[in-house]
Amino acid sequence: GVFGEVRADYKGLASLSVTGRWDWTSTLLYEYSPYFYPSITGGVTLSELIPGMTDTKNDWFSYLKLRGNWAMVGKDAPAYLFDRRFGQYPTLPDGGYSYNPSFSTGFNLRPEMSSSWEVGVDVRFFAGRTRLDVAYYSIQTNNQIVTVRVPVTAGYVLQTRNEGSVKNHGVEISLEQDIIKNSDWTWT
């Protein structure tokens, strides 16, 4: 694959990162083999912009950052999915090979793609000893690669294909506190 990234930072106040990845896979048919997935991430440290927030006299509210990101992630098919299941047949006296026609792959199988985004805030209190991180996220996965049972009249029993979408979202909250913090030891 090929990966590229561009980063920008303005005096530690704002940051932006844009990435792109182009992958080729041998586990999908040639026309669906290449796929691209990008991402963008950014953040703004508001505490650097608000007068008095980083003042050493104001240690009860010491840091505030807003952040967000969006990304796509690709996933290809498992290895050997398109081989027709030839294998050794050990019960024949001289060995041999067998063909197992009970498994099929949809020939229009495409990569599974997930798209996600997240927004969050990072707040620190009491000279950074108490930290609160709150984020909301959403993930949508399309073209899931699954193996399903099909009617025997199709000529096989199982087929792998792109089937369905899944969406999930939620809130993540993290609260951390430094109980003891000195030059020799930190207990969080």
Residue ranges and their predicted role:
Residues 1-188:
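Extracellular/periplasmic, surface-exposed regions of secreted and cell-surface proteins
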